[in-house]
A protein has these predicted regions:
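C-terminal ends of transmembrane helices
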Residues: 24-27, 98-110, 138-144, 186-190
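Cytosolic, membrane-interface loops and tails of multi-pass inner-membrane proteins
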Residues: 26-57, 111-112, 190-212
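Short, non-helical or kinked segments that cap or interrupt transmembrane helices
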Residues: 35-44, 107-120, 146-154
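Multi-pass membrane catalytic core of lipid/isoprenoid biosynthesis enzymes
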Residues: 46, 52-78
């Protein structure tokens, strides 16, 4: 195993370790004394479920924590391994944070979140193309009101620039990221046709917040 391969693995594990910090779990237990698994209809330890169940401030706290843990993992990887790996170090760490958030080891690799915030942070910190992908995902959510569709569109929209601009390795890592997001959101997406998938009117939530 080459030194650069070891560096890639370490970057991923750094991200995975930080990704295991479940901000939603901390916020929910702080405010309710209960685990996030008992919160709302889904029990998902993510911003959307916390915001729907506990309000805007709690949701923003979760959003902030998930952004910080992903960005911090990418920064640390860049500082330690950036000289040898360049921006690859950031992507491996960010991907590790997404996997850690989705499959936290302290929850026995289950009951993790869906990784939307971590995914967005990874893409935005990595490249302006990532910001465009996130904007496209946000527009999709505003139009459809389905968070699960946006969660799939965001990494999928980054696939073309990943291969065309950054090369095959980033492209393949983005395929992994897209597949991970697809697997996490597909169960909810399948319920759209039956009308059982919960809608989230983000714009309406923001309007109500401004009136308060």
């Amino acid at each position: 195993m080459t030194q650069k391969m070891v560096s890639r693995i370490i970057c991923f594990l750094m991200g995975y370790a930080l990704g295991n910090f479940m901000t939603a779990e901390v916020v929910t237990r702080r405010l309710t004394g209960r685990p996030c698994a008992e919160l709302g209809k889904t029990g998902n330890p993510g911003m959307a479920n916390v915001m729907r169940s506990l309000g805007m401030k709690a949701g923003i706290a979760v959003l902030t924590g998930d952004i910080l843990k992903t960005a911090l993992s990418m920064l640390l990887a860049w500082l330690v391994f950036g000289t040898g790996l360049g921006r690859l170090s950031m992507f491996y760490a960010g991907l590790g944070a997404v996997v850690g958030h989705d499959f936290p080891v302290w929850l026995k690799m289950g009951r993790g979140g869906k990784g939307v915030t971590c995914c967005c942070t990874l893409l935005i910190v990595f490249s302006p193309w990532g910001l465009l992908a996130c904007i496209l995902g946000m527009i999709t959510v505003f139009v459809t009101k389905y968070l699960c569709i946006g969660g799939i569109v965001i990494p999928a929209a980054f696939l073309i620039p990943a291969f065309a601009v950054f090369g095959p390795e980033i492209g393949l890592l983005t395929v992994v990221l897209t597949g991970l997001c697809f697997c996490k959101h597909w169960p909810a997406a399948k319920e759209i046709a039956s009308g059982r998938c919960e809608k989230t009117d983000v714009l309406n939530m923001l309007r109500k917040r401004r009136r308060q």
